[in-house]
């Protein structure tokens, strides 16, 4: 109870502010007056005084919303809006109107003119929400942009600008005059006003979409645009204008479920397909429990000593762990993971001869996304489909570090309280549970646990049949496509008509979800997270008990279970939820099966009979908490490593920006100073230098050197003057082309070295995870190693800048075009992160051999 007592105390404070907003009566004002009031606020608002304007701005947005789209935010929605404005997470149950809630903090913060980003999980929702709320923003004089995948961008505009402006001037309202109810049904809305305030999308450039006051888009596109902006060779080509304020919809899905999944911009590599085929054959020869074992709890594979010896014989090598065989180890581990940790129709499907990943959190297909580090190719080899070439990373960032760049970050979701600690620790965001507008009356039954999966599915079909016969709609949640299809076949056998909603049928999603609350409807769906569509009850369904939710398995996260449950009982509707489980379900079998089996044996449960008790439901919740804790630990590890990389990424990107802004002379000066200082450090002692060694080290510059002074200070001054003179001569030789050429060289040098550095960092992560078992802190080791490497990379950047600049003739148009074409070839990927997981490996010496633990 303490948790919610604290939440109630927090909510109490917001009610005082709600009362203040409610006292502002704007009904007598016409739309033109409301718009002018907001213009006046815009002229006076600053980051320092923004909170003073909350009551007035929220009241204006509420009144305008009522008049142009016919929706008036409830008092609890005002609380949600204040929570979002304060940079917190608002937990709002399904159907409580999150989309409308966001309009108030969006408008308030957009008045500062720095751009507000509204982040959604897919293109469909970005377009839908921007157009749905668009009339509010347009009426208030704000521009709305939408960014979509495939580089498409739009602006929300009036369908008929003349008609819309006329309606605003004449104070035409969707909300009928004198209507005092809380909610206006569609049939009661003023049709003339609805027609006047219609909007549409106009295609614009990406940069223009970001220049709008408000920009809607997906998490992946916001992240990729940031990475792409840091690969451009002209400042004008950048599209984003900063990271001021973001509201993330389905915030738990994006900031927690996807936190281990970095965004990667990559290009083709030179690995051969034949290597993957060869190691796929080797993996097939290995025998489980003889050559390797599987730890299902940690989803890891451990090679045995016998396995290592057998592999060494097959490969005809002496030591599998010799540095020269590192690449063989990568191929082998990926092949084993492909065979024993990744399942067809669960983790991926084969579609048109390609491996397409299935999102484990939402059940959606992720076309175009590929596992990194050669894993995707290993799965292609396993399934016998065409092996696509591996990719080289040009730029990468995790969602954790991308979203932490925003000055203010907030989020909304139906389920966040269970992850409150992670939101607080990683993002500094508190979670506030927003009260529902009407009391929630859904009945959540205790779990029913069966001995076998077969018994469980038979019971599920029996329950569906019973409810179908009385006309009650049923939504069944499954954990994989495979199980959806198994249940579908069983229902077809019983002649029960039903719809299937999973990654193979995503085109029909919105249509199917809309029908899921109708009388007699039966819908099977993989994870319902991120669906973004409310299920409204059809006529006569309330009387039958509302929508029944059946869960066929508990997920690793309680949140996903709660999201499934939350599909029923929206806005005070009746509803019911039951989970049917079995001892063969993964989470129970791996984490708690023995305890439950003992209980079932004690109470002598007959075949086909379930056991249910609140204690059992609690036991399963404890198991889920344990799994959540393990996953949180992995995400924290990833963040610690990526934060080291993030500091370096920001340093490189800010240096690129410095160069893009035209500071080429200063860059060359820095390069010369660094170049000289490093040589003096190496070849001078107590103020005296080894001149011959220095001459030898300067040969790379391709310049003739006369007699050099041998004292440190004199030599430093001599070399600085010499190189600066060469630099000035080169500038004169190239004339007005120099700024462009100098910038081009500097950027190419930085980008190529950064690309190589990212590749090397992958190997460092691998190596430090092994050191962890020599009682060394892997994070500390990673920091030490990467700081040294980063310093070496900067030295190379400065050295190469000097060499290329002093030896350049003239850049041709062809070279510039080639550079632009290279940029076009890069791909955007959102890959599973397979590196931090490697930290979980266990390595032990035994008879000169090592055991290696692989974690997915």
Curated annotation (Swiss-Prot):
Enzyme class: translocase
Catalytic activity: ATP + H2O + cellular proteinSide 1 = ADP + phosphate + cellular proteinSide 2
GO biological process, one term: intracellular protein transmembrane transport
Presence of keyword Disulfide bond: no
Record keywords, A-Z: ATP-binding, Cell inner membrane, Cell membrane, Cytoplasm, Membrane, Nucleotide-binding, Protein transport, Translocase, Translocation, Transport
Membrane association type: Peripheral membrane protein
Main location: membrane
EC number(s) recorded for this UniProt protein: 7.4.2.8
Keyword presence, Transmembrane: no
Binding site for ATP: 77, 95-99, 534
GO MF annotations in UniProt: ATP binding; protein-exporting ATPase activity
Subcellular location, record wording: Cell inner membrane; Cytoplasm
GO cellular component: cell envelope Sec protein transport complex; cytosol; plasma membrane
Subunit structure of this chain's protein: Monomer and homodimer. Part of the essential Sec protein translocation apparatus which comprises SecA, SecYEG and auxiliary proteins SecDF. Other proteins may also be involved.
Family from the record: Belongs to the SecA family.
HAMAP family linked: SecA (MF_01382)
Described function: Part of the Sec protein translocase complex. Interacts with the SecYEG preprotein conducting channel. Has a central role in coupling the hydrolysis of ATP to the transfer of proteins into and across the cell membrane, serving as an ATP-driven molecular motor driving the stepwise translocation of polypeptide chains across the membrane.
Name this polypeptide is given: Protein translocase subunit SecA
